[in-house]
Amino acid sequence: MVNLTRIYTRTGDKGTTALGDMSRTAKTDLRISAYADANEANAAIGTAIALGSLPEDVVKVLVRVQNDLFDVGADLCTPVVENPEYPPLRVEQFYVDKLEADCDRFNAELEKLRSFILPGGTPGAALLHQACTVVRRAERSTWAALEVHGEVMNPLTATYLNRLSDLLFILARTANKEIGDVLWVPGGERG
C-alpha cells in the first residue's frame, strides 16, 4: 500500500524526476510524457464517471479501468530489467483480454455502425468520447517512448491503451443507446 505523508519533495525543481526504480531522468523524457498522458486519461474517465450519469454496468468497468491505468503508469515509470530487486507491477495479457471481453459484451448490444459518429449526444457519451481521444494520445506517447526506450519498456502498455480507446468508443455509444448515435453527415449531404 502507498503511504504518502507529504506531496511536495522539491526533488523535481530542476527539471528531473524519479522513475519507479528511483533512477533520475528529465521531465521531458518520453516515458514521463507517456505516463502523464495515461494519468490525464484516468482523470478524463473520472470526470465521465462523476458527471456523465452513466449506466451502473459502464461505471463498474470504468472504475476497474481507472485502477488498471494506475498499473499502466506504474509499469511505464519502472524500467524493465533482468532480476529486479523487487518485482515491479507489469501489465500482462489478461489486462488486454478483459478489455476485449468488455468490448465484445457491450458492442453486442449496439446497432451496427453505418457511418462515422460525432462526439456528442448525452453528457456521458460526450465525456467518454473525450476520454477516448486522451487515451489515444496516451497510446501514441507510449509508442513514441517505446521507439526510444523499447529495451526497458513493456509493449503491452501500448496494446492496453489501444484496446482501451476501442472500449471507450463502444461505451460512448452505449451511453447514447437511448437517444441514438450522432452520425456524421458528409459535406455534400449537409446542404
Predicted regions and their residues:
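Phosphate/pyrophosphate-binding loop motifs in nucleotide- or prenyl diphosphate-using proteins
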Residues: M1-G191
